[in-house]
Amino acid sequence: MLSHVFLGISDFERALAFYRPVLSVLGVKERFCEPSRPWAGWESTPGPRPLFVIARPFNGEVPQPGNGTMVAFAAATRDQVDAAHTLALSLGAVCEGRPGLRPEYHAHYYGAYFRDPDGNKLCVACHAALL
């Protein structure tokens, strides 16, 4: 369904120091990193898409988080949700919702919410039932 998701960032090195470990916890692989542009991209599935990309805005203006915009990363387990949230907060993220069940979405939805150092709202969610 999606080709890519692009998030604007203000400090490339700071963003890399945040996203590399958080996405690694989720098993998402870095596909490219070009500091001269600067931009970097990750993918979780074999093949060219979908991509998650961070970069300074191409128009050179200051990045602004969207009001009502959120990127949600899939986690295979609830432990991954917990680990990603804890790691993100240790790297400077701001908590927007602690890990937990959210049955208002569906019976097995387990998610956590936070904002990256640029204020972009992110979620890590597991949709699997506990066996």
Predicted regions and their residues:
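Short glycine-enriched loop/turn motifs at secondary-structure junctions
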Residues: 1, 64-68, 106
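Core segments of cupin and vicinal oxygen chelate
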Residues: 8-51
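Vicinal oxygen chelate
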Residues: 9-14, 72-112, 117
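Short secondary-structure capping/turn micro-motifs that flank functional sites
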Residues: 38-40, 104-105, 130
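Short glycine-/small-residue motifs
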Residues: 121-124
